[in-house]
Amino acid sequence: MIGIVTEETLPQPAREEIRLETVLSALSEPLRLGMVRKLLLESPGVPRSCGWFGIDRPKSTLSHHFKLLREAGVTTQRQFGLERRSEVRVTDLEARFPGLLDLVRNWEPPAAA
């Protein structure tokens, strides 16, 4: 028998509950800002798992960052079996804070020292 993998969206704030100060706090950490930028530029509208990002950090650390982004309303996360995939809530963020995602897209990460 073949198992069926169901999709479940994890809890997140409704569009009208997304607060600018919470979004800015979530984006204030350079790693999270870079994760959101990568999703916007390289995978618009396509949910990605944490392995796709190629970040050399413990899985628990990445899970923490993804959770903060989701709870702030920046990303949505869906559970597919054992895998969680994230994507930016573009429509919701543009409706609440027009132009914010353009700033994220245009942000240039500092050069590595």
Predicted features by range, described:
Residues 22-58, 80-95:
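N-terminal helix-turn-helix DNA-binding core of bacterial DNA-binding proteins
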Residues 2-21, 37-42, 79, 89-113:
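Amphipathic alpha-helical dimerization/coiled-coil segments
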Residues 73-76, 82:
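Short, Lys/Arg-enriched C-terminal cap helix and immediately downstream tail that follows
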